[in-house]
């Protein structure tokens, strides 16, 4: 059996909370066209991401990448921000 690695997902969003130590909450929005009503719908989701240096604050735009589980809810890591 061969070990084939899947590419890790990369998402972009905005930090909405940085109160926890080494953790930020990132809100990721996506738009898609509804298949029946043909209207664009905006959907958002929140992810807990690991920020090892505590350098991102609320309002920062960041990119997060999927990683191994760090805790019960954290499976994403902040890779860079603006």
Curated annotation (Swiss-Prot):
<dbReference type="Pfam" id="PF00366">
    <property type="entry name" value="Ribosomal_S17"/>
</dbReference>
<dbReference type="GO" id="GO:0019843">
    <property type="term" value="F:rRNA binding"/>
</dbReference>
<keyword id="KW-0699">rRNA-binding</keyword>
<dbReference type="InterPro" id="IPR019984">
    <property type="entry name" value="Ribosomal_uS17_bact/chlr"/>
</dbReference>
<dbReference type="InterPro" id="IPR012340">
    <property type="entry name" value="NA-bd_OB-fold"/>
</dbReference>
<dbReference type="GO" id="GO:0006412">
    <property type="term" value="P:translation"/>
</dbReference>
<dbReference type="InterPro" id="IPR019979">
    <property type="entry name" value="Ribosomal_uS17_CS"/>
</dbReference>
<dbReference type="GO" id="GO:0022627">
    <property type="term" value="C:cytosolic small ribosomal subunit"/>
</dbReference>
<comment type="function">
    <text>One of the primary rRNA binding proteins, it binds specifically to the 5'-end of 16S ribosomal RNA.</text>
</comment>
<comment type="similarity">
    <text>Belongs to the universal ribosomal protein uS17 family.</text>
</comment>
<keyword id="KW-0694">RNA-binding</keyword>
<keyword id="KW-0689">Ribosomal protein</keyword>
<dbReference type="GO" id="GO:0003735">
    <property type="term" value="F:structural constituent of ribosome"/>
</dbReference>
<comment type="subunit">
    <text>Part of the 30S ribosomal subunit.</text>
</comment>
<protein>
    <recommendedName>
        <fullName>Small ribosomal subunit protein uS17</fullName>
    </recommendedName>
</protein>
<dbReference type="InterPro" id="IPR000266">
    <property type="entry name" value="Ribosomal_uS17"/>
</dbReference>
<keyword id="KW-0687">Ribonucleoprotein</keyword>
């Amino acid at each position: 059996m061969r070990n084939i690695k899947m590419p890790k997902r990369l998402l972009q969003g905005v930090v909405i909370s940085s109160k926890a130590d080494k953790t930020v909450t990132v809100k990721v929005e996506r738009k898609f066209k509804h298949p029946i009503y043909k209207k664009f719908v905006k959907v958002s989701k929140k992810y807990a991401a690991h920020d090892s240096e505590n350098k991102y604050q609320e309002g920062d735009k960041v990119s997060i990448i999927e990683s191994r589980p760090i805790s019960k809810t954290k499976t994403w890591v902040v890779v860079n921000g603006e």
